[in-house]
Amino acid sequence: MKIAVIGATGKAGSNIVKEALDRGHEVTAIVRDSAKVTESRATVVQKDVFDLKTDDLKGFDVVVNAFAAPLGQEHLHVDAGNVLIEGLRNISGTRLIVVGGAGSLFTDESQTLLVKDAPGFPDFVYPTANNQGKNLEILRGTSDLNWTFISPSAEFALGKRTGSYQVGKDTLLVNSKGASYVSYEDYAVAVVHEIEKPQHLNQRFTVVSES
């Protein structure tokens, strides 16, 4: 498949690029600075996400939004999401995969409290979580786009690629140790698996792995 990854040099994006290439897909890394791309197997396009138009996104089976907004500019998660919605809604057959956050998940099955609103949630993370949540709500209100929003666990860290993970929908998951954890490597496995075998069209899902 032909896959474009926006934000391909970040932790999530770079692992998704590698996983997709390792599985034999054609990957285009769309980045602001081509010098930061270390994966020689990927095609590189140097372009800011806010400059992307429909013509830039044509020809891809899937566009992965792994954009990471700088601290203090977290509203750009919403802005970048809107750019991609507008760019893709006129392209038939191209799917949008969004690298989301855990803050918009519910804390438990009662589904009365979001992670980002729970006591003890870090203040400096809240703007990112809040704006990623807004992006999700906008997607849920979009009827002419094929999308999937993938939330990691509360702890999202570089680790090992085990290839094993558990899937949930809108509630924060924990592993056998009681930890809400997923490595970037296993998250990338889940993303590419969803690309290859779609199970969550126009939905959000979340993943957890062993720590």
Label each region the model flagged.
Residues 2, 6-9, 93-96, 170, ...:
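Mid/C-terminal beta-alpha module of Rossmann-like enzyme folds, strongest
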Residues 29-36, 153-154:
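Short, polar loop motifs at secondary-structure junctions
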Residues 34-91, 199:
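NAD(P)H-binding glycine-rich loop region in Rossmannoid oxidoreductase-like domains
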Residues 142-144, 157-164, 194-203:
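Glycine/proline-rich active-site loop of Rossmann-fold NAD(P)-dependent oxidoreductases
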Residues 3-23:
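N-terminal Rossmann NAD(P)H-binding glycine-rich loop of SDR-like oxidoreductase domains
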Residues 4, 28, 148:
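Conserved beta-strand positions in the Rossmann-like core of class I SAM-dependent methyltransferases
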Residues 137-157:
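Conserved beta-loop-beta element that borders a ligand/cofactor-binding pocket
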Residues 34, 83-127, 137, 141:
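Conserved Rossmann-fold NAD(P)-dependent oxidoreductase catalytic core, especially the SDR/UDP-sugar
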